[in-house]
Amino acid sequence: EASQSPQYSFESLPQKICLICGDEASGCHYGVLTCGSCKVFFKRAMEGQHNYLCAGRNDCIVDKIRRKNCPACRLRKCCQAGMVLGGRKFKKFNKVRVMRTLDAVALPQPVGIPNESQALSQRITFSPSQDLQLIPPLINLLMSIEPDMVYAGHDNSKPDTSSSLLTSLNQLGERQLLSVVKWSKSLPGFRNLHIDDQITLIQYSWMSLMVFGLGWRSYKHVSGQMLYFAPDLILNEQRMKESSFYSLCLTMWQIPQEFVKLQVSQEEFLCMKVLLLLNTIPLEGLRSQNQFEEMRSSYIRELIKAIGLRQKGVVPSSQRFYQLTKLLDNLHDLVKQLHLYCLNTFIQSRALSVEFPEMMSEVIAAQLPKILAGMVK
């Protein structure tokens, strides 16, 4: 559920109302009209190294009386309102830039989802016909468009520091985000969606896709024994312990271990990856909601076909489908933790000496507060 606190806009309020808590404003502080209390709170939070966590659901009411109850929600609301220390402001997610990025890759016209898939029943069923050993055409296409691994640019000749590791991970995240945008352009059915929907889906799913990709690389290249962020950034347990995000590493480590346990095939992984892209949408839905539902149903059927390549029989196939979709569901809590950590690090990036590339900064500033406020489903 979205935050219960009133959503203010600068244009709609009297000039003396704090946009954070509704108290009387003392002026425009850090780019936003606020009271003295919220001004001081924001400055201390940004310059300190606090790791605020909400004890509730990240939807606490922030008003004059209760503004001190939950610093995590208060800080999130400051960020959501646009407060920036030292004039650090970011535009809304640059739709023009994304569209140019989408157009930058020379690819053939979008490949439609096969007619055979479109003609299948919307019900999820496991039939004997799925015993065919041939890889379905759409899954073959997913294999052909899978992006190459990208490098983090991390200098392994120097000792790890918290700021250097996080900066390298952010650089890697920027490159992977660009890779996701390019990959989505060649994904059958995706360009049939409204351009606003395409951008929204990428914004809401990028963290899930990156973590899922991390799990796959760790599974395939180091048998789930380490975290394989990139060929030049592989963390063994010792490096994880020495990092400032060891608990998050342990949580992320569970994904490749699940891949090992389930022995996930490449065909299954590719279908699950697309379903992650299509997993989170705004509460109000999408502009091309019907096309989105059709696309999602088609890729659910492709996952069933991928399962059928190795698993024979209705009952084992159904059990396998449950295990794989449960794995996707279990990503939700992990990704929420990563969103919180990412937003906190972003807000305090100057104090922590952590660099955030521009495109990644725009996504974080524009969408993470909405996701954490429960404005998606």
From Swiss-Prot:
Location of the protein in the cell: Nucleus
GO molecular function: DNA-binding transcription factor activity; sequence-specific DNA binding; steroid binding; zinc ion binding
Stored PROSITE patterns: NR_LBD, NUCLEAR_REC_DBD_1, NUCLEAR_REC_DBD_2
Record note on modification: Palmitoylated by ZDHHC7 and ZDHHC21. Palmitoylation is required for plasma membrane targeting and for rapid intracellular signaling via ERK and AKT kinases and cAMP generation.
Pfam families: Hormone_recep, zf-C4
One cellular-component annotation, GO: nucleus
UniProt keywords, alphabetically: DNA-binding, Lipid-binding, Lipoprotein, Metal-binding, Nucleus, Palmitate, Phosphoprotein, Receptor, Steroid-binding, Transcription, Transcription regulation, Zinc, Zinc-finger
Region Modulating, Pro-Rich, residue ranges: 1-15
Stretches annotated zinc finger (NR C4-type): 18-38, 54-78
InterPro entries: NHR-like_dom_sf (IPR035500), Nucl_hrmn_rcpt_lig-bd (IPR000536), Nuclear_hormone_rcpt_NR3 (IPR050200), Nuclear_hrmn_rcpt (IPR001723), Znf_hrmn_rcpt (IPR001628), Znf_NHR/GATA (IPR013088)
DNA-binding region: 16-90
Domain of life: Eukaryota
Ranges for domain NR LBD: 130-364
Main location: nucleus
Annotated stretches, region: AF2: 138-377
Phosphoserine: residues bearing it: S127
Domain note: Composed of three domains: a modulating N-terminal domain, a DNA-binding domain and a C-terminal ligand-binding domain.
Family of this protein: Belongs to the nuclear hormone receptor family. NR3 subfamily.
PANTHER family associated with the record: KNIRPS-RELATED PROTEIN-RELATED (PTHR48092)
Quaternary structure annotation from Swiss-Prot or TrEMBL: Interacts with CUEDC2, SMARD1 and with UNC45A. Interacts with PRMT2. Interacts with NCOA2 and NCOA1. Interacts with KLF9. Interacts with GTF2B.
Cited function: The steroid hormones and their receptors are involved in the regulation of eukaryotic gene expression and affect cellular proliferation and differentiation in target tissues. Transcriptional activator of several progesteron-dependent promoters in a variety of cell types. Involved in activation of SRC-dependent MAPK signaling on hormone stimulation.
Protein name (record): Progesterone receptor
Source organism: Ovis aries
